[in-house]
Amino acid sequence: VVHPIDGRFRLRTALITGITGQDGQYLAEVLHDEGYKVYGLIKGQRNPKAEMINTELPFVELVEGDLQDLSSLIAALEYTQPHEVYNLGAISFVALSFKQAELTANITGLGVLRLLEAIRLVGGQDNPIRFYQASSSEMFGKVRETPQTELTPLHPRSPYGSAKVFGHHTTVNYRESYGLYACSGILFNHESPRRGIEFVTRKVTNAVARIKL
């Protein structure tokens, strides 16, 4: 897939945060199959999951960056020059978010703001960058209606859910204030063989699979 930029043609590129998670891995495969050059944001040169990505997804080029550090995000965007950014990175353990509320807010909430600010600074009319934010059903928290829709009131009941609400509204704010192509998708619980075994639902599905086999 090529895309005309100022009269030139350039391979479409995408940058994925949360590349080591189940969604990041599957998304990378889909984009690669569509002809994209795929980059994955990873924190630290010695990240223990880097080897896994290099083995399982050899077509992904890992770049260093940290959702807690604006300058590192700017550097990552300047290096990758992506057409699209998919923000799947977060501290996604709801129970853990009560024990590490500040860290959860800093990464899962403020990390969205930093990434959008980096996109605003690096992108522009000549290099527009599209942004996708992975929002969560945890934003609904104390559910008032079933099923939930985009219009359902948000009532988070955990630091994780509150951080996701901040990221969700920040995405709207940057779209309306700066004209960025920024959107959110509200994700509900979903399982796959790539989901970490540390998640309760993954433990259940893994046990069922073992019994079946």
Regions found by a protein language model. Give the residues of each.
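Glycine/proline-rich active-site loop of Rossmann-fold NAD(P)-dependent oxidoreductases
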Residues: 165, 190-206, 213
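N-terminal Rossmann-like NAD(P)+-binding domain of SDR-like oxidoreductases, especially those catalyzing
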Residues: 2-192
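Charged, solvent-exposed alpha-helical segments that act as regulatory interaction surfaces
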Residues: 145, 210-213
